[in-house]
Amino acid sequence: MPKASDIKKNQAIEHNGKVYLIKDVYKSTSQGRAGGSIYRVRMYEVATGLKVDESFKADEMITLADFSRHQATFSYVDGDEYVFMDNEDYTPYNLHKDAIAEELPFVTETTEGIQVFTVNGQPVAIDLPASVDLVIVETDPSIKGASATARTKPATLSTGLVIQVPEYIASGEKIKVSTVDHKFMSRA
């Protein structure tokens, strides 16, 4: 059993008889003699999708749930469900759009490196690669000679995500975007 200090985003744990998927982990260090660090965890109950915020002491023992990852590719949308196909055995994994709302601006049919997380055989979340390639559908015209400046302009991507890009980037270009901080990285 791992300690609370070992838990990470997108792990599944059992807590108070229920299975939760961890979305965020924040470490706060106590002042003075109060003791060790406290980990504030935002997690979602797998069965109902309810958000729960919990605090754990660094040395508190945590029980991990039966959890596995599967390489998958986005296939299609079925109403409010997004269907991902397992790359090995073509098993379809249906995920409600609310469960993957944070990841959706980076998901296209050409996105590679997507992993579907399953808990007890049930799909609960996806994990994206560190960066994805997306096409700019709308931005201000590019400015010649603007590569020497660090000024940026807004650009709307093929998924609807709006990010800041350098002035020399034009509509129709494919760019690499960080899925961690939602920022322009380079041309693809």
From Swiss-Prot:
GO terms for cellular component: cytoplasm. InterPro entries: Elong-fact-P_C (IPR015365), NA-bd_OB-fold (IPR012340), Rib_uL2_dom2 (IPR014722), Transl_elong_fac_P/YeiP (IPR020599), Transl_elong_KOW-like (IPR013185), Transl_elong_p-like_YeiP (IPR011897), Transl_elong_P/YeiP_cen (IPR001059), Transl_elong_P/YeiP_CS (IPR013852). It comes from the Bacteria. GO terms for molecular function: translation elongation factor activity. GO terms for biological process: peptide biosynthetic process. Belongs to the elongation factor P family. HAMAP family: EFP. This is Elongation factor P-like protein.
